[in-house]
Amino acid sequence: MPDAHVIHRYLSRYLSLSTLILVLGGCGSIHQTTQGVPAIEQALLQQETFTFTRLAPQRYTPVDWPEVLNAQVLLPNTPGVERRPAALIVHGGGWRNRGPADMEGIAEQLAQQGYVTVNIEHRFSPEYRFPEQLHDLQQAMAWLHSNADQWQVDVERIVGVGFSSGAHLISLLALSGSEGPLAAPHGGEHTRLAAVLAGGLPSDLLKFNDGRLVVDFIGGTRAEKPEAYALASPARQITDQAPPFFLFHGSWDQLVPVDHATDFYQALNAQGVESELYLQRGRGHFASFLFRRSAIDAGIAFLNRQVQPDSKSRQKLYPSG
């Protein structure tokens, strides 16, 4: 028979999550799902998907970069389309391992929806510390802009996609702006994103105990480097200029607890930023990625709305005149 304390803990967690959903229901949009129960309007996805061409791995870093880094590029076959959206995609792995292969399925799904996808490597900790991984993403955006004409990319419709530590990096990129400490020295207007799809996002590094992954990434403990922890936390960089965010997160995530998503979502709403939170009930960190299809469908539908030519979010990011 299960221990009464265990039952109480899980009931408390479920009731707290249900209460949170009721409280937040009036701002933004929350989906709560179970496996096999998709909460997605299929009309928001392209019904006719595109084939795509897979390029050989492309080096995106300049010759003087500390490490050679490559990107996997998929070009959708979209005859008659003058310019199409693009997606910068970043894998997870605790900032220290894994690679673009983990995100290949998501990249293919985006390419089928008409996005040029750029699925990148980045430098790993502990050899390289924050903010060097962010610099890799900023360089990838510069490289993507330099290839925009060749690949028929509309640079005002580039979105960011990531999971776990990749979601952290892509969110930091989205919030770094064109000025300030996160923008120097490789940032600028070219790093603007039209929207973000982020799963399992560690949004506030100050919430973690001094575990190896975060300490290796920052290069010290919270007590030793509190300013760096704050600067590296997307939740502490939100302004009303943030692009729209679609977040998905497992409600039973023990590695990156769900309050990283719910608090981030609340902060976005407080700034008037369009956002959606897709809670995967009963899923942990890795299960939320392995069984992600309905969340990704919902996320891509959200991205599709943001990259429409008349999107309000696009007008906010790229005002005319």
Task: Describe each model-derived feature in a short phrase.
Residues L247-H249, D253:
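Short beta-strand/loop motif that positions the catalytic acidic residue
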